Amino acid sequence: MTKKILSIVALFIALLLSACTNNDEPKYGYLVLEWDSSLNLTSTQIIMPQESRTYGFKAENVKSVTWENVPEGWTVSMSEDNSSISVTAPAESSVSGITYTIIIVVEGLNGEIRKQELLFLFVNPKAIAYDDPKGIFVLNEGNMTTENGSLTYITPDGFVIDDAYKAVNGTELGNVCQDMAFDNGKIYIISQNGDENPVGTTFENDGMLVVLDAKTLKKEKSFSKSELSVLDWPTHIAVLDESHVYIRDNKGVYRFDVNTKELKFIEGSEGAPKSKFVVMNKKVYTIIDGYISKLLEITADEDIVNKKTLPYSAPYKEIYSIGKSDDGKIWLSAFGFGKYYIGKYSLEDNTIVSRQISIMPSSGASGVSFVTKGNDIYYASGTTIYTLKFDENPELGDESGLEAEAVLCDLNSLDSNAKELYNGLGINPATGMLYVNTIKGVGPFYTTNSIWEFNINGDWTTPQNKFDNYTNFPAGFFFANNN
């Protein structure tokens, strides 16, 4: 009797287990879905017009793959071997800075549904307001033998447009771009070689001087090397108006009228060095060295310089570069009698305050050896960034600057690829952020590079942002409404 009862119980358990197994086993097997492990599906992808992003995956027991929330003009497609999905932004659009979420829906044969969100930030170069003072321009020389110049733009939100000029116009800037200036809603960009380099290689580009709309970057005028054939390797530009565009070359300074194409040499500017102009009070300033250093002042009234001799008390034999101060004076970096200086010169009463620094500040071909925010001076030697809190107290001597100088950081210690700085620093007047360009080296190494952004009041061991491998021999930093 006991054996019979046990047999019945065993049979019941077997039937119960069988029933459970039959209920759990799907008719078609489980949905298997694995996205490419190299993809960061949780981050927002920056995408520009006509650009595509591809997402690889492996799947089994799939009934269908569909997509939802696709914006108008965007396309989503599956590869022929059903191993990836591509998302393409529209070629034309009137918007920029919009975030979109496209949902990929995968349904299994067993009815299971899995959804994957793909996040995109649509950045449209043709719909950006480039005259925002918080934006950052990086003008690139390009490789003299093989490529044209370009204009990198970093939006106030920190998104990089690799060549904004080309993205807007469909054409390229001249070979070896050197400098740019802002005036009355326009940007003026000068290149060293234009459409032909010194060995006779021709390039397809927009020439030696390009004038563009400061808000849209659309080209308005351009001038080829043949139209400006008098110029010998131009390096710097300053603008008072369309009839007074000043260009420095190996001879000196010329005035160019973009409407009449008149190009006239400024008498007395012979030997003006590679140094960025200062534009202040409707006048243009540059420098000239000699036994006694001088400022060259140029006005729209006449094509001749007014030479301003620095005080005899100034211990300078060579001026590296000049800059505009917030209180209408002129900053300068200089050398004399074995010492290096930062000075502040008053045009009104011809007085100068000097403070000694410990190193020769780097400038490269940009002619920018320092930048300022108020009375705080920033400069570099090698890959080391320095600052000087400039105290104008007349009771202090020149040597007081050595005590006020401080080392902020060595970029090479933060990134071993930062082997050298390329051209001068930049500081955005609207944000106070400081910018530095570094490269791994010349030759094949220049493509390994970084744009560094530092909060001058923050931690100098960690940049606020760092943008890698965007530049092509950067000529310098530029900011809208900062001529």
Question: What are the residue ranges of the model-derived segments?
Answer:
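Bacterial Sec-dependent N-terminal signal peptides
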Residues: 1-45, 110-136
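A short beta-strand motif characteristic of beta-propeller blades
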Residues: 159-172, 218-228, 261-268, 304-313, ...
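Low-complexity "stalk/linker" and mucin-like segments enriched in Ser/Thr/Pro/Ala/Gly
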Residues: 42, 68-84
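Blade-level signature of beta-propeller repeat domains, shared across WD40, Kelch, NHL, RCC1
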Residues: 446-483
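Short glycine/acidic-enriched loop and turn motifs that connect beta-strands
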Residues: 142-146, 193-203, 252-253, 291-293, ...
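Solvent-exposed, low-complexity, repeat-rich "mucin-like" stalks and linkers
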Residues: 24, 34-67
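Repeated scaffold domains used in trafficking and secretory/extracellular systems
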Residues: 172-181, 229-238, 270-282, 314-325, ...
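Acidic, serine/threonine- and glycine-rich low-complexity intrinsically disordered segments
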Residues: 256-384, 392, 396
